[in-house]
């Protein structure tokens, strides 16, 4: 399936000078800037009968309010959240594999406490807005070589 990384879109807009924000800007500001663009990309894919995976943290939890029902029937949303217990016990594993998908230049700001706060807030917002989520509570194994 084709995919769109909202983070790649963000960095392209920032590096090209077409975005007044920076990578360090507040997530709420980045979401407010990026979501209208991403929303219209999603609509275009649906109208063209194309499948598209859109991934990233800049999708608002009230995303449904951005679409008419004819679009909503074509959208599958899922949020991945770690439980507090999982993060407390397996933070070292998360750090060890942080660069598997993309090479991160500086992850020093990523702390166990920060991830716990973010995941707790994401879970709360999923529940508030009735968004589907997967709560990762137990160790799991994904064989990356088989993908």
Task: Please state what every model-predicted region is.
Residues 2-57:
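Conserved nucleotide-sensing/catalytic segment adjacent to the nucleotide-binding pocket
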Residues 8-11, 59-60, 81-88, 140-141:
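Conserved nucleotide-binding/hydrolysis micro-motifs of P-loop NTPases
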